[in-house]
């Protein structure tokens, strides 16, 4: 990094900078590396991965290995139809011996997406091979959509907004908060095949809003504007996830 930054005192200060934990405690780097969440970590990750991608690309070309590296921040995957003998060992050698990094072998794995039930989770998406059932060809194609981890995190946030502790809030306020959450989350998944997951999320959100209205029933009539919860939420403009970008709408 000092080869690229003219003010070396600034780079040294950045490496020594710590990271503040949620409880307010400052964590300082000890020995090698920087604390996760430190201000310099994303910059260092991009610098190292840039050179790794360059060096690994040259090594792959020399070994006749066709591959593509996809990276974001400090995370990356290497995609290939097959592996040349010794290429994976070469990748580890580049990272550890040439670049001085440590490969976390617990988080590093080789996946064969052609294997049954194999899946790759990357940047909130889950990639897996599924069989075609619509046209009856039986062929497998690459399916990708929201990961289960992302869906569970979203549902936890929806649960928090519709929790009993918020029962004194106006329905409009809760709907506005849930809508904002759904719009931001759904906007990230405008590619792929998220329709099945979207339907499940819509059902969960409607169920949570129905329970929220039930808890307020002692304070006013449970359903004011319709005979069903779906109709009631349509009146309040509850957001509904839909696959097509132009079709995502409020109920």
Annotated model-derived regions:
Residues 1-251:
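Non-catalytic terminal/accessory segments
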């Amino acid at each position: 990094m000092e080869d690229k930054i003219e003010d070396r005192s600034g780079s040294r200060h950045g490496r020594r900078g710590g990271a503040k934990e949620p409880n307010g405690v400052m964590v300082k780097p000890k020995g090698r590396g920087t604390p996760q969440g430190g201000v310099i970590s994303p910059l260092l990750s991009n610098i190292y991965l840039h050179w790794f991608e360059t060096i690994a690309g040259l090594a792959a070309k020399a070994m006749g290995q066709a591959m593509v590296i996809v990276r974001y921040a400090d995370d990356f995957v290497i995609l290939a139809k097959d592996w040349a003998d010794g290429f994976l060992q070469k990748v580890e050698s580049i990272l550890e011996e040439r670049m001085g990094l440590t490969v976390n072998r617990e988080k590093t794995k080789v996946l064969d997406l052609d294997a049954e039930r194999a899946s790759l989770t990357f940047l909130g998406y889950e990639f897996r091979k599924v069989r075609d059932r619509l046209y009856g060809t039986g062929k497998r194609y690459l399916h990708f959509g929201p990961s289960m981890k992302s869906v569970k995190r979203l549902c936890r946030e929806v649960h928090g907004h519709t929790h009993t502790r918020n029962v004194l809030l106006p329905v409009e306020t809760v709907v506005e908060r849930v809508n904002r959450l759904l719009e931001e989350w759904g906007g990230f998944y405008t590619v792929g095949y998220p329709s099945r997951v979207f339907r499940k999320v819509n059902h969960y959100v409607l169920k949570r809003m129905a329970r929220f209205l039930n808890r307020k029933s002692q304070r006013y009539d449970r359903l004011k504007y319709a005979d069903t919860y779906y109709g009631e939420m349509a009146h309040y403009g509850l957001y509904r996830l839909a696959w097509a970008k132009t079709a995502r709408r409020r109920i």
